[in-house]
C-alpha cells in the first residue's frame, strides 16, 4: 500500500534550531525537500563530498587492475593536490613533446651558439628554424624524461592512498550536507524558526511525543489539493525487495495512485525468465547470486549502515527469485545453453512450447499479456465498485478480451473465427465506455480502442526476444562444434578445442549481455508502459526520503 502522509509545520525557538534539527534527524520520520536548499554552507558541504568522491575515482584510476602495494594514509586534500600537480606535469609533458617534434628535424644543436653565429651575420636560414628553442634537443629530452618520471611518482603516491579511509567518511559527509540543507530550509521569523515537511501518519505519535518533550509547536494537516506528497510504499513482506528495483529504475507512483508492487514483482519475474529464455543462464545468475549472498553475510557483520544492508539483501533476494524463475523456464522448455537434454525431450511442456509453428508460444505470450492488462482494468473496477465508473473499467476488460481473440485469429491460433457472443461483449463494452467518456475522450475513443490491439500484440516480444536468444546460443554452439570437427588430425585437436571454447565463451557471453539489455528494455516497458497505462499509473511521484543519518 501507499502510506498516508500528513503535512507538518514545526515551530521552535530560533536559538534552538540546530538542536531541533538534530532531534528531528534522530527521529528519522520527516521528509524534507532538501534538494530545494541552497546557500554557501550547502555548497561548501557538497564540495567536500564531491572532493571525496573525486579522490576515490582518482585512486581507483591510478591503481588499475593489478594493484598490490601497501596502502598509506592520505587525506582527500593530498590526493587532489597530487592530481593538480599531475595535471601541471602532463601539460608540461605535452608542451615538451610538441617542441621536440618541432625541432627534431634540425638535430641536437646548441641554440646559444646558433644565436652567436646569427648575431655575427652568418646566414643559417636553411639550417635553423625561424625561432630558436630555449634549450637544445638533448636537454628537452632529459627534461621530458624527468617530467614523465614525476608523473609516475604522483600516480604511485595516488595509488597507495587509503581508499577505504576516504570511503568511511562518506556517511559523515552526506550527513553534514543534509544537515546544512535542512538548516537552509528552516526559516527564521523573529524569535522562532519554522520548517515544513511530510510525515507518515503512522509516525505522527512519535513526533508529537518529541514535540511535547522539546517544546515545539506543530501544525499537522492532510495534503491540500494541488500538493504532491512523497510516496512511501509498504508492499506485502514477500514482495518488499521490489522497492529497490523501483529505486534502481528511478520510478515511483504518484501519492494518489495504487501500489502495484505485487503484480510488478510477479510479472517482472515471469518476463525476466522468458526474455533470458535459458536455464543455463539462470544457473549462472543463481551461482553469482549465491556468491553474493556469501560475501554479504560475511560483510554484514562489519561496520555497515543498516540501510545499506537492507538494499544489498533486497537485490540478492530479487536476483535469487529471477534466477530460479529462469531455471524453471529452462526446465519447462528444455533449454540449457542453447541445447536440450535428451531425457527431457518428451516432457509435455517441452513438446508444447517447442511446437515448430511457434503458435503455442505466441498463444502463451498473448494470454500473459491479456491477463496482465485485464488484471489492471478489473482492479480499477473493483477499486471503484461504489462508483458507476467501475462499469467503464470492466468494459475495457471486455474490449481487451475481444482484441485478444482477434490477435489469436490473425496469427492463425484460433481458426474458428470470432464467435457471436464475443461481438456482443465488444458491442456492450464499447457502448459502455462511450457513454462514460467525456469531451475529448469521446473523440479519442476509437484510437484508444485500436491501441488495445497493439498493447496485446506488444507482448509477443516475450516470444521474439526469447527465441532470438535461444537461436543465437544454438548458432554459436554449432559454430564451435564445426570448428572442432573440421579435421580428424589428432595433433590439431587441442588447438581446435581451445578455439571451440573461445567461441563458446565469447558467443554465450555476448548473448548473456544482450539478455540483460532486453530485460531493461522489454520487461521494464511492459510493466511501466502497457500495464501502467491501463492501471492509471503515471510514475510521476517521488520517493519518501526521511531526514536521518546515512548509517540508519
PLM regions: where:
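Long, charged N-terminal accessory/stalk domains
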Residues: 1-264, 292, 313-319
Amino acid at each position: 500500500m501507499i502510506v498516508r502522509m500528513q503535512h507538518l509545520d514545526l515551530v521552535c525557538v530560533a536559538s534552538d534550531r540546530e538542536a531541533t534539527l538534530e532531534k528531528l534527524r534522530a527521529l528519522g520520520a520527516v521528509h524534507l525537500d532538501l534538494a530545494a536548499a541552497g546557500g554557501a554552507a550547502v555548497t561548501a558541504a557538497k564540495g567536500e563530498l564531491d572532493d571525496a568522491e573525486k579522490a576515490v575515482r582518482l585512486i581507483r584510476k591510478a591503481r588499475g587492475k593489478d594493484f598490490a602495494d601497501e596502502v598509506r594514509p592520505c587525506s582527500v586534500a593530498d590526493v587532489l593536490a597530487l592530481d593538480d600537480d599531475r595535471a601541471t606535469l602532463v601539460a608540461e609533458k605535452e608542451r615538451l613533446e610538441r617542441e621536440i617534434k618541432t625541432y627534431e628535424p634540425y638535430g641536437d644543436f646548441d641554440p646559444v651558439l646558433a644565436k652567436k653565429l646569427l648575431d655575427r651575420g652568418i646566414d643559417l636560414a636553411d639550417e635553423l628554424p625561424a625561432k630558436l628553442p630555449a634549450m637544445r634537443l638533448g636537454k628537452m629530452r632529459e627534461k621530458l624524461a624527468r617530467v614523465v618520471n614525476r608523473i609516475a611518482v604522483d600516480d604511485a603516491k595516488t595509488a597507495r592512498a587509503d581508499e577505504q579511509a576516504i570511503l568511511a567518511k562518506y556517511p559523515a559527509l552526506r550527513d553534514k550536507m543534509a544537515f546544512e540543507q535542512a538548516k537552509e530550509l528552516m526559516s527564521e521569523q523573529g524569535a522562532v524558526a519554522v520548517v515544513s515537511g511530510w510525515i507518515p501518519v503512522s509516525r505522527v505519535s512519535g513526533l508529537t511525543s518529541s514535540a511535547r518533550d522539546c517544546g515545539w509547536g506543530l501544525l499537522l494537516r492532510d495534503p491540500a489539493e494541488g500538493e504532491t506528497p512523497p510516496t512511501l510504499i509498504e508492499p506485502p513482506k514477500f514482495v518488499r525487495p521490489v522497492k529497490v528495483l523501483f529505486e534502481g529504475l528511478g520510478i515511483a507512483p504518484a501519492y494518489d495512485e495504487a501500489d502495484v508492487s505485487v503484480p510488478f514483482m510477479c510479472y517482472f519475474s515471469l518476463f525476466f525468465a522468458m526474455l533470458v529464455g535459458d536455464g543455463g543462464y539462470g544457473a549462472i545468475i543463481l551461482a553469482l547470486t549465491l556468491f553474493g549472498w556469501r560475501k554479504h553475510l560475511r560483510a554484514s557483520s562489519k561496520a555497515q549502515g543498516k540501510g545499506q544492508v537492507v538494499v544489498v539483501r533486497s537485490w540478492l533476494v530479487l536476483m535469487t527469485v529471477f534466477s530460479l524463475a529462469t531455471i524453471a523456464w529452462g526446465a519447462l522448455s528444455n533449454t540449457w545453453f542453447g541445447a536440450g537434454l535428451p531425457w527431457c525431450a518428451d516432457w509435455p511442456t517441452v513438446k508444447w512450447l517447442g511446437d515448430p509453428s511457434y503458435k503455442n508460444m505466441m498463444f502463451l505470450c498473448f494470454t500473459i499479456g491479456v491477463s496482465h492488462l485485464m488484471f489492471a482494468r478489473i482492479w480499477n473496477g473493483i477499486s471503484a465498485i461504489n462508483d458507476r465508473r467501475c462499469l467503464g473499467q470492466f468494459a475495457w476488460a471486455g474490449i481487451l478480451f475481444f482484441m485478444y481473440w482477434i490477435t489469436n485469429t490473425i496469427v492463425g491460433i484460433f481458426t474458428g473465427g470470432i464467435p457471436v457472443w464475443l461481438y456482443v461483449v465488444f458491442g456492450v463494452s464499447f457502448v459502455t465506455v462511450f457513454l462514460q467518456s467525456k469531451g475529448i475522450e469521446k473523440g479519442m475513443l476509437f484510437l484508444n480502442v485500436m491501441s488495445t490491439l497493439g498493447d496485446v500484440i506488444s507482448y509477443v516480444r516475450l516470444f521474439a526476444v526469447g527465441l532470438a536468444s535461444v537461436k543465437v546460443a544454438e548458432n554459436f554452439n554449432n559454430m564451435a562444434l564445426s570448428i572442432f570437427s573440421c579435421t580428424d588430425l589428432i595433433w590439431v585437436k587441442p588447438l581446435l578445442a581451445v578455439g571451440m571454447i573461445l567461441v563458446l565463451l565469447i558467443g554465450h557471453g555476448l548473448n548473456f549481455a544482450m539478455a540483460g539489455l532486453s530485460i531493461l528494455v522489454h520487461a521494464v516497458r511492459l510493466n511501466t508502459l502497457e500495464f501502467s497505462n491501463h492501471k492509471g499509473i503515471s510514475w510521476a511521484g517521488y520517493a519518501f526520503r526521511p531526514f536521518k543519518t546515512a548509517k540508519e
